[in-house]
């Protein structure tokens, strides 16, 4: 996948920016506040219909403006051209148009433009709460597997219905028969999600090991899935996992009714990262944590390429901060074999297949 043109109108500090990126590595450099990250975020909107810096569309409005517009023109590895337009206004919300057609469901666009991000804030995937790691899993798998996205949407819908019913049962205003129906549905969707997550972790690990060995000293990474309901998910078939969910929900039924809340499931699960058998969150240095996350993000490149037969667009914000020159050179060499890559930095840097673009202040 390649971006041929991106236009940002009244988007953050860009009143009207039009930019035609080069192939290979695009290094956007300039002082803090010049709008480098905003260019990456605009591309991210075209790919995933949202930003990666902020969760609120309104925060992307230029100061004093009531709407923003993003236009992107993309060409796939199979030479298929796509035009993507994102418009947001305070009055009418967000609208997504692809090749002239308005999309009523943003989820149907996910995966069309595979995208990988890195930003310093994403260190929370390593050292933050479980919700950050679940978000990492879901964002990656949803782009590569539309069935997973549908399972997630179905799971969330049934979970909301089940929680609402548990509250009604707590107040004794509903029959328990409907709870059995929703529990059966939830168990099946939960098993689909857990199995897809396990498959993803298994498939990404070889790439993670290879890249980590290039950017760091020889260290052995491992990722363990930690279920909120199942002691060990690894030895179970999908049918066995469905049955286990059924049994756990049956055991916890009275407690769930008393609390008015579903006890556990994929929405409460976690993953644990290890280096040389030591949990990274507890024992690794900040540099080791950063190298691990960078390697894991870069491993997504091979994962998406294999799954989608499409090279993903890479958006790496402030990638090189806190890295010494030798590691920067290694990363440049690795990224030179990728497709189109965007990196932000405060200073001009050189490397193989690098095109530098100066983003002056207040464009």
Swiss-Prot record:
One of its GO terms (molecular function) is single-stranded DNA binding. GO terms for cellular component: cytoplasm. It is found in: Cytoplasm. The keyword Nucleotide-binding applies. GO terms for biological process: DNA replication; DNA synthesis involved in DNA repair; double-strand break repair; SOS response. Gene3D superfamilies: P-loop containing nucleotide triphosphate hydrolases, RecF/RecN/SMC, N-terminal domain. Coiled coil: none annotated. Signal peptide: none annotated. ATP binds at residues 30-37. Belongs to the RecF family. The RecF protein is involved in DNA metabolism; it is required for DNA replication and normal SOS inducibility. RecF binds preferentially to single-stranded, linear DNA. It also seems to bind ATP. This is DNA replication and repair protein RecF. It comes from Chlorobium limicola (strain DSM 245 / NBRC 103803 / 6330).
